[in-house]
């Protein structure tokens, strides 16, 4: 296995975005691609590591730059300043997501007929909005994602959706989970929700502990959600991944 990584520039109109590409050069044939939608901190090392993990599974991993310019905000105010406009204008967000999706499908190592997306926190919302917006995904997986629907009507989708959710997440109350289930059913999705008890926001991020119970790493929920992820990707990609 020879995993190679490199930055990949793409455009959303005049906005330059810098994705992070990871793939195994050992096998020359085009492979399924898993897009990684970053959390509110931007396309950081965590998102890049997830892309590398996808490459290790035999897929192409492509971490999107949904803020543009590879912005990596550090303070809460700076993170909100970048995330807020996209969260408030979901049409703008979908346009940005479509640009990243298109860029990935044009990569020579990618089989554009086998696309999936995963996302964390804000990236979970991005992943769900890809499904809502009708992007051609085989699978879409949200980890402790924001679940609220956009104002615009969602499109029908054949994507298989997995929502990995901490039941005590203050950013996605139980009623929002129920609402999402109804929404995905109306869209025609094959969907599943894995809700983890005694689990809050950011449960996949090692070292996270806000001290007030709102954000905390949970190794059991992290492991269980990752196993569910590998299972779903294996289901939709079959033997198209090297190690699937």
For every predicted segment, state its role.
Residues 1-244:
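N-terminal cap/leader regions of alpha/beta-hydrolase-fold enzymes
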């Amino acid at each position: 296995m020879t995993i190679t990584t490199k930055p990949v520039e793409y455009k959303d109109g005049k906005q330059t975005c810098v994705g992070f590409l990871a793939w195994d050069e050992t096998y020359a044939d085009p492979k399924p691609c898993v897009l990684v939608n970053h959390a509110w901190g931007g396309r950081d090392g965590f998102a890049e590591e997830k892309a590398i993990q996808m490459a290790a599974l035999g897929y192409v991993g492509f971490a999107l730059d949904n803020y543009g310019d590879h912005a990596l905000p550090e303070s809460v105010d700076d993170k909100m300043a970048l995330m807020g406009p996209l969260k408030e204008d979901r049409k703008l967000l979908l346009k940005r997501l479509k640009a990243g999706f298109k860029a990935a499908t044009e990569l020579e190592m990618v089989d554009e007929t086998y696309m999936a997306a995963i996302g964390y926190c804000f990236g979970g919302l991005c992943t769900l909005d890809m499904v809502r917006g009708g992007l051609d995904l085989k699978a879409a997986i949200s980890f402790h994602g924001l679940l609220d629907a956009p104002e615009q009507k969602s499109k029908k989708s054949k994507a298989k959706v997995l929502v990995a959710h901490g039941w005590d997440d203050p950013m996605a109350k139980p009623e929002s989970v129920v609402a999402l289930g109804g929404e995905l059913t109306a869209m025609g999705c094959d969907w599943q929700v894995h809700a983890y008890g005694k689990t809050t926001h950011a449960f996949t991020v090692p070292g996270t502990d806000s001290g007030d119970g709102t954000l905390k790493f949970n190794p059991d929920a992290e492991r269980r959600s990752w196993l569910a992820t590998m299972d779903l990707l294996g289901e939709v990609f079959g033997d198209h991944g090297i190690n699937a």
